[in-house]
Amino acid sequence: MGRSKCFMDISIGGELEGRIVIELYDDVVPKTAENFRLLCTGEKGLGPNTGVPLHYKGNRFHRVIKGFMIQGGDISANDGTGGESIYGLKFDDENFELKHERKGMLSMANSGPNTNGSQFFITTTRTSHLDGKHVVFGRVTKGMGVVRSIEHVSIEEQSCPSQDVVIHDCGEIPEGADDGICDFFKDGDVYPDWPIDLNESPAELSWWMETVDFVKAHGNEHFKKQDYKMALRKYRKALRYLDICWEKEGIDEETSTALRKTKSQIFTNSAACKLKFGDAKGALLDTEFAMRDEDNNVKALFRQGQAYMALNNVDAAAESLEKALQFEPNDAGIKKEYAAVMKKIAFRDNEEKKQYRKMFV
C-alpha cells in the first residue's frame, strides 16, 4: 500500500480557486498523518472538547506570511487560538525525522512542545529553522500554484488575509483514484490549471502550442457566456502554458511570431474581461503587455482607449483610438467609441472656456 493522499479545494473571496493534493507520510509519522487524514474526511464527528465537527471543511486559512508559509486548521475558533485533534485537545510530538527542506512541506502548528491539535501550515520556501520544533507529516504533490495564490492574497493585521481563504471541500483520495486536478471546473478543459501539475510534461512544442489555443478557446467561450471571471482565469492559464513554449526546441522565426501574436491576443482578451469588472487600471496594463508583442494590435488599441476613457483620461483615449482607426478606419465599434471620446473632450473644452470668461468679467 502506498502513502495516503488527501485533497483540499480552496476558495478565495468566495470564488473557487483550485485543488491542493497532499501526500501524507503515514509510514514515518502515522499518528500525525492519521489525525490530518480524518480531519479531512470528517468521519470522527463532533469533538468532545470543543463541540465542533472534527472536519476541515469550511475552515479558513487564518495566517499568511509571504515567503514563509500559509496556516489553517483552527476548526473551533478560526483565528489561530483554537483547534482540536482526533485524540483530544492536544497530542504529543511524534518525531522530528522529516525536515522542512523545501516549499510545499506540510507541518503541525503548535504553541510549544507536545501541543499539536488540528492546526497545520504549508511552507512556501525552505524553513530549516523549524526543524526539531514542528512535526512534518506530508507534502504538496499538486496544487502548489493554489498555495502561491493564497500566499499572495493581501493581508491585514496579524498576517490575516483580507479575503476569506476557505477550505471549500476536503477528503481522502482512494489509492489509484483520479486526483481531480484535471477538468477541476467541469467545463471540458481537461488540462490542470498549472503546467507543473501535469502527470507527464510533453517535449513537443506543437503539443504546448495546441494546448495554449485549446485553453484560450475555452476562455473565449466563457467570455461569450458573460462569465468574465472564468474567462480571465482561462486566459491566465493559457499564458502559463505559453510561457513553457519558449523552453522547447524548434522555435524558428515564424513560430516565434505566432507565439507573440497569440500572447498579444490573450492579453487583449484579458483586458476586455477586466473592463467588464471595472478594473480599468488592470485592463490598461494588459493592453500595454499586448502591444509589446504586437504594436499594431487594433483590438488592444481599442481596449486601451476604453480603459483610458474609464479612467477619465480622454486625451489619451483619443490618441489610442486614433491609432486604432489608422489600421481599421471603417470599424464601427472604434468609430463609435472615438465619437463618444471627442464629445467628452468638446464638452470639457467648452466648460473650460466658460470658466475663463468668468475670470475676466
Curated annotation (Swiss-Prot):
It is an enzyme of class 5 (isomerase). GO terms for biological process: floral meristem determinacy; protein folding; vegetative phase change. The keyword Chaperone applies. GO terms for molecular function: peptidyl-prolyl cis-trans isomerase activity. Keywords: Chaperone, Cytoplasm, Isomerase, Repeat, Rotamase, TPR repeat. Residues 7-172 form the PPIase cyclophilin-type domain. Its EC number is 5.2.1.8. TPR repeats lie at residues 212-245, 298-331. Expressed at low levels in seedlings, roots, shoots, leaves, stems, inflorescences, flowers and siliques, with highest levels dividing tissues. Binds cyclosporin A (CsA). CsA mediates some of its effects via an inhibitory action on PPIase. It is found in: Cytoplasm. SUPFAM superfamilies: Cyclophilin-like (SSF50891), TPR-like (SSF48452). Disruption phenotype: Plants lacking both CRC and CYP40/SQN exhibit strong floral meristem (FM) indeterminacy with reiterations of extra floral whorls in the center of the flower associated with reduced AGAMOUS and SUPERMAN levels. It catalyses: [protein]-peptidylproline (omega=180) = [protein]-peptidylproline (omega=0). It comes from the Eukaryota. It holds the Pfam family Pro_isomerase. One of its GO terms (cellular component) is cytoplasm. Belongs to the cyclophilin-type PPIase family. PANTHER family: PEPTIDYL-PROLYL CIS-TRANS ISOMERASE (PTHR11071), PEPTIDYL-PROLYL CIS-TRANS ISOMERASE D-RELATED (PTHR11071:SF561). PPIases accelerate the folding of proteins. It catalyzes the cis-trans isomerization of proline imidic peptide bonds in oligopeptides. Involved in promoting the expression of the juvenile phase of vegetative development, and, to a lower extent, in regulating the positioning of floral buds, floral morphogenesis and the expression of HSPs. Collaboratively with RBL and ULT1, influences floral meristem (FM) determinacy in an AGAMOUS and SUPERMAN-dependent manner, thus contributing to the floral developmental homeostasis. This is Peptidyl-prolyl cis-trans isomerase CYP40. It comes from Arabidopsis thaliana. The lineage of its organism: Eukaryota, Viridiplantae, Streptophyta, Embryophyta, Tracheophyta. The gene is CYP40.
